[in-house]
């Protein structure tokens, strides 16, 4: 699996993410993808070949392995990382659309150089307006996917621990046989580590949702305050104009009266 390609895509989104979003990407890449590639795959590399049962019945080992491990831990984690990272593509596509619109407006407004158009792609897009809704929706989807996979993992492997001895009576085993898992303690440690990393990602995503909401409320309050101050300033200017205009009228009336008296 090309994890470098996935990281390149996520890094493109990372430029337009919040500070919490950047921490989330670091946790995903360093503590999950790197561990999955560097360590976990070697630990689970012999899971099927080293799974043995105390019987010589052909097919019993394979049937018992499939019964207790319907899907490999490695494949389940890989699928989880891919699906959890997918919502970030929504943000990437939205940012690309906004940058395309900005380039289009620049071309229509004036003659621009290719270098200026290339610079548009490097600009950080502010998370506001429709992009805010896209971004917060992607974070919500990440939370849902993480929680769903943790629940699926619990349904498939109750207790999240690797059992050393398994009792299997599935056909074609002649009777209840004992099956043994290789390196159960090491696999349990990696399982707990990956689940803790998944829990940390959920906490970071929830924190990012609250951060985005607080940021939006702050911008709204600032706009309301600025519009209120502008409105008060406008009213004060109108009042000053009225006062100034009234004093001018009074002076004009007094001057006309003085001229009339002098003429008389």
From Swiss-Prot:
Q: Which residues lie on this side of the membrane: Extracellular?
A: 46-75, 154-191
Protein topology in the membrane = Multi-pass membrane protein
Entry's transmembrane regions: 23-45, 76-98, 131-153, 192-214
Arranged from A to Z, the UniProt key words for this protein are:
Cell junction, Cell membrane, Gap junction, Membrane, Transmembrane, Transmembrane helix
Positions in the Cytoplasmic compartment: 1-22, 99-130, 215-264
The protein's superkingdom reads Eukaryota
Q: Name one GO biological process term.
A: cell-cell signaling
Q: Where in the cell is it found?
A: Cell membrane; Cell junction, Gap junction
Tissue expression pattern:
Lung, liver, intestines, stomach and kidney.
- Please list the coiled coil stretches: none
Report whether Cell membrane shows up as a keyword of the record. Answer: yes
Q: Name one GO cellular component term.
A: connexin complex
What the entry lists under InterPro entries is as follows: Connexin, Connexin32, Connexin_CCC, Connexin_CS, Connexin_N, Connexin_N_sf
**One GO MF term:** gap junction channel activity
What SMART domains does this protein map onto? CNX, Connexin_CCC
Q: What is its main location?
A: membrane
Q: Which family does it belong to?
A: Belongs to the connexin family. Beta-type (group I) subfamily.
Q: How does it assemble?
A: A connexon is composed of a hexamer of connexins.
Its annotated function is as follows:
One gap junction consists of a cluster of closely packed pairs of transmembrane channels, the connexons, through which materials of low MW diffuse from one cell to a neighboring cell.
> PANTHER family from the entry?
CONNEXIN, GAP JUNCTION BETA-1 PROTEIN
Name used for this protein in its record: Gap junction beta-1 protein
